[in-house]
């Protein structure tokens, strides 16, 4: 069994608070599930925030959210994140007592539990499936398409299908291996009413935030014991009756409109 601390949607970009926001360590492993801040525009501040977390956690998992590439591009954002991963983890540059940074962009990581058991962590942004009838509303109503260069609904949908295909393949490959699987994403994989603010459940731009994956192999698998995500600014923690998996979010939200229920959330797997 391992203990994983879950945090997302800190939005340290406004007001800028990378240097003062503290995460109190309650577990050896930390999952940052996106929208921590502007990764490219605030590169220096963001990486210093990560370094502080690495001094407190054995592993810091980083999933990129839709705000990370704002005022830049997705390619540039991922390029910087991968560079940090290399530089912060290489033996020559790694400080004593510093943890490991693991960027999850269609990536798999294995954690050995204290009893010899293995937990498989799968992570990606996921994005969402925007149907054609909602494309115009989402394009005009979601700020990502204004603030991320070279990004539109078509590319967003392509990224979703790519991430979903990867998740399905990874989970299928692990079927019946006897290992617990944890899935970490930024976007929501479900439209279960427990995962969304009642005020937004009928929103015309809802498909820009969540996708119903109830028929997808990665969701239906009973090997997946935990699916944690962010993006919705609405906190939840429940067990999906159909699969037995725990569904968890722990999102702070914007500083001036913080989400109810943001706590020091730790999940044991």
Task: Label every model-predicted segment.
Residues 120-182, 187-204:
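Active-site-proximal loop/helix segment associated with metal-binding centers of metalloenzymes
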Residues 1-62, 68-76:
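N-terminal active-site segment of His-dependent metallophosphoesterases
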Residues 5-8, 30-35, 61-66, 102-106, ...:
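Active-site neighborhood of phospho(di)ester-bond hydrolases with catalytic His/Asp-centered motifs
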Residues 113-115, 206, 211-226, 233-269:
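Binuclear metal-dependent phosphoesterase catalytic core
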Residues 11-17, 38-41, 67-77, 110-113, ...:
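Active-site environment of divalent metal-dependent phosphoester hydrolases
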Residues 1-5, 108-123, 133, 180, ...:
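Beta-strand-turn-beta hairpins that frame and shape the catalytic cleft
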Residues 78-145:
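Hydrophobic alpha-helical segments and helix pairs
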Residues 20-22, 48-52, 97, 103-118, ...:
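Short amphipathic alpha-helices and their capping/turn segments at secondary-structure boundaries
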